[in-house]
Curated annotation (Swiss-Prot):
Enzyme class: hydrolase
Protein name as it appears in the record: Elongation factor 4
Annotated organism of origin: Cupriavidus metallidurans (strain ATCC 43123 / DSM 2839 / NBRC 102507 / CH34) (Ralstonia metallidurans)
Entry's EC annotation: 3.6.5.n1
Gene Ontology biological process terms in this record: positive regulation of translation
Location of the protein in the cell: Cell inner membrane
Catalytic activity: GTP + H2O = GDP + phosphate + H(+)
Family stated for the protein in its record: Belongs to the TRAFAC class translation factor GTPase superfamily. Classic translation factor GTPase family. LepA subfamily.
Keywords recorded for this protein, A-Z: Cell inner membrane, Cell membrane, GTP-binding, Hydrolase, Membrane, Nucleotide-binding, Protein biosynthesis
Role this protein plays: Required for accurate and efficient protein synthesis under certain stress conditions. May act as a fidelity factor of the translation reaction, by catalyzing a one-codon backward translocation of tRNAs on improperly translocated ribosomes. Back-translocation proceeds from a post-translocation (POST) complex to a pre-translocation (PRE) complex, thus giving elongation factor G a second chance to translocate the tRNAs correctly. Binds to ribosomes in a GTP-dependent manner.
GO molecular function: GTP binding; GTPase activity; guanosine tetraphosphate binding; ribosome binding; translation elongation factor activity
InterPro entries, per the entry: EF-4, EFG_III/V, EFG_V-like, EFTu-like_2, G_TR_CS, LepA_C_sf, LepA_CTD, LepA_IV
Length: 597
């Protein structure tokens, strides 16, 4: 056990985490040069394209160190994005050490800090590494200073390297072996194994990635999953070097995979503990929690006959993504579709992109909403994740909305514009600190404001330099109202939004004006109204197309002309009673693009 090192790599997006992992795998001979490819641990196309890691992957490597000993290194690749923070914390709790990779030319950024604090809280040894030192604009001294200022760990002996050229990678591995403690655990104790991640394989069912903390896991063992209480028979165990290699057993301190003929991913929850039926562990490993979706949106197929196909696609995605939730939903405007719950905005984008890409779906997405808690007059509490389900205003005692703590990092030139943005978004400043040229701002902002377009606007006001991460803090009472859009006094449920009262007038006017541009002119007048309950707060009219009925009258009596006009008017009125307005596809997208002032 003294020769095992379990570690993961923490970094902000684009600081070179996956490239460094590639180099370490190559140096340890995990893959031959022919099999080596860029970002070898990122298996989905979308991961490679966006350069982000979504699922955790592992590689078990053996390395002959300079002291002549052979060490087993288990690299656990973690997602770096804030939406997947629970998966990150599970991956980190399976390690004893973490390489903190910081881009020497850019310094510390938000997600580095968020994940690094998670690591320190879990008692993981953090080993700082400066990457990209081959760049002409690299400034290692400044980066070291920032690591010490912002994160507060000693970085004087941070290892410089360049993952691209491979320079210094050996030093990184040596530093890792020297600083990271070997795993503690008892191979003879009852089995406790932590599920770090799980995914679905078409041939063998669910593959679970586990870290064995105590005990030994062998094929033919009957195991119990402690959170769900399900029992399974282990079929095979093994390790990834990134290729899968079967082993006879996994013992304490090792990281590997387990296949137990599980049919669906819901049964193998990330963070759950596996133990054997014959010798049960006293208690599960700490830290397990159910992942709850934070952001909801409606997904509808453009063609209504694609509904079944959309359901199948969502079910296939759920095989590989247990945090995705969905339930059928009917909208008068959009027909049949699904209400889906996501961990955050990035997660939502990825699901949409995978549906469009891997399953060829054409989708309409409604505006994302967060989960509100509604206290009713009769004392019951509802959770509302869909504006259409919001009860009548007369029944509502109070509405609570989720508040998140947002940490923002940016160069000091952009502080003013970022603070203005946060204030517009109803943010309350909690803290502000300077670290060299970088500034850290902490705000509490309602989550609803974040999901709208906060991230895009943050990037634009800071020219792409600001980075952020957020975490849920609490529910707070808030004066929010539901704004309905009526077209010819029919409610269009898919266009309803929940906004703060101070912003509702503006929002209603904007949406109505936007609709007026988008809805094509009909043979009769179309009235577009925005309403809160029964109060109309904004109205726009789309004028009717009309024929010039007076063209055939030359001169003649005014009463003749009046008669023709009245007749036309009566005809239009009749049409208006029976006509329905087709709402074009763009209208639903336009809702997402209404800019806040």
């Amino acid at each position: 056990m003294d020769h095992i090192r379990n570690f993961s790599i923490i970094a902000h997006i684009d600081h070179g985490k996956s490239t460094l992992a590639d180099r370490i795998i190559q140096r340890c001979g995990g893959l031959s040069d022919r099999e080596m490819e860029a970002q070898v641990l990122d298996s989905m196309d979308i991961e490679k394209e966006r350069g982000i890691t979504i699922k955790a992957q592992t590689a078990a490597l053996s390395y002959k160190a300079r002291d002549g000993q052979v060490y087993n290194l288990n690299l656990i690749d973690t997602p770096g994005h804030v939406d997947f923070s629970y998966e990150v914390s599970r991956s980190l709790s399976a390690c004893e050490g973490a390489l903190l990779v910081v881009d020497a030319s850019q310094g510390v950024e938000a997600q580095t800090v968020a994940n690094c604090y998670t690591a320190i809280e879990l008692g993981v040894e953090v080993v700082p590494v400066l990457n990209k030192i081959d760049l002409p604009q690299a400034d290692p001294a400044n980066a070291i200073q920032e690591i010490e200022d912002v994160i507060g760990i000693d970085a004087q002996d941070a290892t410089p390297c360049s993952a691209k050229t491979g320079q210094g990678v050996e030093d990184v591995i040596e530093a890792l072996i020297a600083k990271v403690p070997p795993p503690k655990g008892d191979a003879a104790a009852p089995l406790q194994a932590l599920i770090i991640d799980s995914w679905f394989d078409n041939y063998v069912g669910v593959v679970m990635l586990v870290r064995v903390v105590n005990g030994t896991l062998r094929p033919k063992d009957k195991v119990l999953l402690m959170a769900t209480g399900a029992q399974h028979l282990v079929e095979q165990v093994g390790v990834f070097s990134p290729k899968s290699i079967q082993r006879d057993e996994l013992t304490a301190g090792q990281v590997g995979f387990v296949i137990a003929g599980i049919k669906e991913l819901k049964a193998a929850k990330v963070g759950d503990t596996i133990t054997t039926m014959t010798r049960r562990a006293e208690a599960p490993l700490p830290g397990f929690k159910e992942v709850k979706p934070q952001v909801f949106a409606g997904l509808y197929p453009v063609e209504s006959n694609q509904y079944e196909a959309l359901r199948e696609s969502l079910e296939k995605l759920r095989l590989n993504d247990a945090s995705l939730q969905f339930e059928p939903e009917v909208s008068q405007a959009l027909g049949f579709g699904f209400r889906c719950g996501f961990l955050g905005l990035l997660h939502m984008e990825i699901v949409q992109e995978r549906l469009e890409r891997e399953f060829d779906m054409d989708l309409i997405t409604t505006a994302p909403t967060v989960v509100y808690q509604v206290q009713q007059r009769d004392g019951t509490v509802l959770t509302v994740e869909n504006p259409a389900k919001m009860p009548d205003p007369s029944k509502i005692e109070a509405i609570l909305e989720p508040i998140v703590t947002v940490n923002l990092y940016m160069p000091q030139d952009y502080v003013g514009s970022v603070m203005t943005l946060c204030t517009q978004k109803r943010g309350a400043q909690i803290n502000m600190s300077y670290h060299g040229k970088q500034v850290q701002l902490t705000y509490e902002i309602p989550m609803a404001e974040i999901v709208m377009d906060f991230f895009d606007r943050l990037k634009s006001v800071s020219r792409g330099y600001a980075s952020m991460d957020y975490e849920f803090k609490e529910y707070r009472q808030s004066d929010v109202v539901k704004v309905d859009i009526l077209i010819n006094s029919d409610k269009v449920d898919a266009l309803s939004v929940i906004v703060h009262r101070s912003n509702s007038q503006y929002r209603g006017r904007e949406v109505a004006a936007k609709m007026r541009e988008i809805i094509p002119r009909q043979m009769y007048d179309v009235a577009i109204q925005a309403a809160i309950g029964s109060n109309i707060i904004a109205r726009e009219n789309v004028k009717a197309l009309r024929k010039n009925v007076l063209a055939k009258c030359y001169g003649g009596d005014i009463s003749r002309k009046k008669k023709l006009l009245e007749k036309q008017k009566a005809g239009k009125k009749r049409m208006k009673q029976v006509g329905t307005v087709e709402i074009p596809q763009e209208a639903f997208l336009a809702i997402l693009q209404v800019d806040d002032k």
